[in-house]
Amino acid sequence: SQSVGQITAGIASELDQQNYLILLGNTELDEQRELGYLTAMQRNHVAGIILLGCYYSPQLARAFKACRVPLVVTGQRFPEVPCVYNDDRSAARELAQRMLACGHRRLAYIGGTEKDQAVGLARRQGVQDALNAAGLDGDKLPRLCCSAFTMEEGERCMNELLACCPDLDGVVCVTDTVALGAMRALRAAGRAIGTQVSLAGI
């Protein structure tokens, strides 16, 4: 995603200033590959390890805690492991609260896999928190899960939501890219964005 590219560029720039070389490994969110890279990098005596975008699991948490070199996880919370992450739940809650403050009451959510506790689970919970605080039933939030954070998936999910919830008046999307796809579907359906339907990505 664009954000991962920006984070990687920032890390590379800082390491370059400190005269470190960066070694990249792409695991495609495969836990066994993540564990394999972790072992290989320790054997090769790297100065430190930064992990971007892994899913939480007890096995990974144990491996991270046992790591013999400095290690930081970004984008996900692992107990007793140094982590840098966003407050995804609060971000989603505040976004939904803004929609509710504009008078929208029939919100829907386009999210990601809830194996990802930060982006997938916490963001959905944030939207539900806002609905519950407004006296609505967050458990009844219409939601769909994207298989990837792409415009195509956003468009597909939005079309499905329009078919099952034609009276929705607000949509929170897991990312801006997904929201762009949802916008395309709303326009094709003749829905006026900003008046008939509010739309936003986190």
Language-model regions, residue ranges each:
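N-terminal winged-helix
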Residues: S1-S13
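Phosphate- and divalent-cation-binding pockets in alpha/beta enzyme and binding domains
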Residues: S3-Q6, R33, Q59-L60, G126, ...
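A conditional alpha-helix N-cap/helix-loop micro-motif detector
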Residues: V4, D30-E31, G53, D88-R89, ...
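Bacterial carbohydrate/catabolite-sensing allosteric modules
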Residues: G10-L21, G36-H45, K65-V73, R77-I202
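Short beta-strand->loop structural element characteristic of the AMP-binding/adenylate-forming
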Residues: I22-N26
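Short beta->alpha connector loops
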Residues: E28-E31, L52-S57, T177
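Intrinsically disordered, low-complexity polar regions and short flexible loop motifs
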Residues: I49
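Active-site-adjacent beta->alpha loops and helix N-cap segments on the catalytic face
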Residues: Y56-C67
